[in-house]
Amino acid sequence: MASPMQKLGGTVKTVSHGALVFIGFVATCAAGMLAHSFLRMQPLHGLEFVSVLGLAVVAARMKIKLPGLNGNMSVNLPFFLIAVAQLSLFEALLIALASTLTQCFPKDGGKPKLLQMLFNLSTAAVAVGLGSLIFHDSPLRGVWSSGLPLVMATATVFLAQTMPVATIISLTEGVKLLRIWSSIFQLSFPYYVLSVGITSIVTTASRQVGWQIPLSVLPVMYAIYRSYRVYFGRALPQANDLAMAKGAGAAH
């Protein structure tokens, strides 16, 4: 969902009862969203669906470690938003789940953690599902500028992804919720703004040219991935040094 669609994947150090309850709640919401998508199922969009699915899966492997947070971000968000805007709810959920599942596998070939995978998949399903419902069912569609439903859907995806991530980090690491969410907001908000801009251009061009337009987004996202990697690579040592200094100060 980035996120991820910004998408984060922290390590659950100590799974508290509260964290387990929250993960169960998010998973239940995701199951409900999937069931709802089955009830609203429409014919697949064929090549357009397959192309966005493939692009989202490839983009999911372009992961960046976030400085100061126990998590990472992939550059698959524009493809989530393209799915939200141009495909059905069921198709958007399939793309989000496949891309997020791909993101869950560590680059070093290690095994993913099942509880973490469940949480990440559930969060992505809820976020993208809500975004799709907001976009397609908004009463503002056709009344206001055509870009407003996309902005509303992106804001929904942003909140539905970042708030659960901040909550689970708060529950597992004992850090204040608003402090965690503020850090996530500062790191990921520009990426969401960029993603909604890219999606707006793609959806407009697709009406004139065709479904092939999303294919041009992957090189752009790779360039963004490289830029973020360089920027966060410089910021990460500083964040680690700050965390160590705080830990040393707390020990005295």
Q: What is the role of each PLM region?
A:
Residues 2-72, 80-229:
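Short helix-perturbing small/polar motifs within transmembrane alpha-helices
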Residues 175-180, 231-252:
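Membrane-proximal helical linkers
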